[in-house]
Amino acid sequence: MAQQDQRARLQPKSLYNEDILGPREPGNILFPLWSTRGVLFPYTPSVATGSSAVYDPTSFIHSNFGYNAYVRSYPKPITIEAEFTAQSNDEALYLLAVIHFFRSVTKMYFGINPYDKAGTPPPTLIFNYLGDYQFNNVPVIIKNFEYTLAADIDYVPINTVNNTAFSANIGVNLPAGKNGGYTWVPSYIKTHLELDTQYIPIKLRNEFNLDEFRQGKLLNKGYI
């Protein structure tokens, strides 16, 4: 039996690839991400999450004990500590795209360009990790992205102008700046991400069933 890919991925919803990744052409800094339809985490990340039930504590007059009134339940945010390396030209271009991707998906459309999208919030992405019964098509938003450009590592220069000789699916051709199109990326970087689930209210109301969830039947629909 063939084993499916269990690596962690953050991807656009299938209908919104170009809205989030930009055009599939070398003039786009996110072009390397088209080869993986989003961000593929190359190394096993550390993932932390959980589930919470909120209760409102209530007390009674002249009583020795209190009472907790149930309020709501929710999945805790998903935090990811992930490593990336740049040991080749392709890896360096991919890492550059990853950094810019997370900068982009934490921003909204603003101003007059384009006017018809003004006010559109950051996108909902799809998170997959560890197969069918862990994180399977979980809809998430990116609430925080952090990384450190450390002083004690090497930085790799890459040419971003007409860089198509290494891999047709990775190479980019960006406008040359004052450095002639060269930029530097760290040979090793650790990133920190905070995700939160973002379900569609009407779909949640019509689809969620605790009995089915308990049996694991809703895990393939993104519920955790």
Where are these regions (language model features)?
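Compositionally biased, intrinsically disordered low-complexity segments enriched in polar/Pro/Gly
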Residues: M1-I224
